[in-house]
Structure formats: C-alpha cells, structure tokens
C-alpha cells in the first residue's frame, strides 16, 4: 500500500451506500438475512440493541477477526455485509469519539454513541503463523474499526439506514481456501467478488472528527505489538472484564498512552479473542 495515507477509510461504496462487515452466530445471521433486518433476531430475543457492536469496512480485517468464519468460535460463524446509507453513515460518524486520543477524543467515550479505533491494516498472507489466520498487519497504514452503542446500534433496525444485509460467508471461505493454496489472486477475486474497496472521499469536518489527517510515525516507532481491535457484539459489562491492548503508536510511546475517559473500558474486550 505504498503512498497510502496513514489513516483512510477504504470500503466498497458508491454515492448511495457504504459496506461494512460483522460476524454473527448462525441463528442471528440467518434471521437477519431472511428478513433483511435485525428486527427479526431482536424479536426472537437473540440480538439486542443494548449491546455494543463493532463494524468494519475492511474485509481482510473481518477475516482476521472471525478466522475466515471457520477458525474461531460459533459466535462468528457467518459473515454479513451491511450496506449502509452513505449519507446517514457520514452523519452518524460526525458524533464519533476517538478511542486513542486526538481532537475528538478529548470528549469522553463512556457515553459516545460511536467510538473509532484506528488499527494496523491487515493484508492476506498465506505464510502467516496460525494465530494470524492467513493475514498479517501493516505498520504504515491504519484501518478503521467502528464501535456502535445505544442510539447508533438502534439505527441498525432502521431500513433506511441498513439498506441490504447479505451473507458473504462463502466468499470468505473460498478466499481462505485459495489463499491457503498460495493463490492470492483467486483469493482476492473471491473476497471482493462484489467490487473493490476504494478510498472514501469525506468532507473536511468529518476527517477532523475521525483524526484522519495525521502523519504516520517514523517506521522505527511502529514496530511494537500490533493492536487487536474490539471484536464481535459485546456489552459494556463484558468489555470491562479484561485489559486493553495498546495500539502500536502507544507501544512506541512506551505503552503508557492515556486514553480518553471511558475508552479503555470499551477496548478491554479486545484481548478476549
């Protein structure tokens, strides 16, 4: 990703929608896809708008988090692509708070409806060690992870916000199979069957909120432990159970980075998986 900005939202998108991913259990995913809405699993009592959830536009990051849908747990058995209204997505993101400082991070994360974490981007890599599940982290490019809670999670019930819900599990599994056979070209064709992830052009005020216009630290300063983003649906009670994983920028600073109030709690579930 030479000459790629340090922080950039890359997604399958057009003027009308932006695609993000999340992995779910079979029962939640099946009901959501069939109804094209999370109202069905909510009504069945298996999905809750009270639980914080993390979405991401990077397919490879999603593959890493869910182990290509086959290498982790049953709660991440199926991968869904959520096509969100672009206009409403950008409006929602204006209320975001940064998990790791920055201008917007000066507000508290404790009550923020949207929390943004910038983690090292990941790319497909067939020689990766087992825990990296056919991916590896990049030190010079960041990928956005978007945590939703409260009113932002409730927006997932709105059909004017979530335009389409598509089960893309088989795309992920086929990509993993091709990648394991060292056919990265075929793996990419499978993973991005519906189109490539492209940089999103965003208005300056939103870029400022998301802390996008920052320079990458010198290469020597980003060789620390790669951060682990927040995982699948998790309540804030569960999130407070374990210790947070610092970003590589925090490691470079000696691992003593002070997160905005409430943010450390939200990121503690990162080490559970």
Language-model segments: which ranges?
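ADP-ribose/NAD+-binding catalytic cleft of ART/PARP-like enzymes
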Residues: 1-48
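Intrinsic disorder/low-complexity signal
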Residues: 1, 232-252
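Long, low-complexity, intrinsically disordered segments enriched in glycines and aromatic residues
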Residues: 87-187
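A structural signal for short, well-ordered beta-strand segments and their strand-loop junctions
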Residues: 20, 81-83, 145-147
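Short helix/loop capping segments that flank catalytic or ligand/cofactor-binding pockets
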Residues: 29-32, 63-65, 92, 156-157
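Glycine-rich, aromatic-bearing surface loops/beta-hairpins
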Residues: 155-233, 251-273
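Residues that flank catalytic or metal-binding motifs in active/ligand-binding sites
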Residues: 17, 78, 142
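ADP-ribosyltransferase catalytic core
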Residues: 44-124
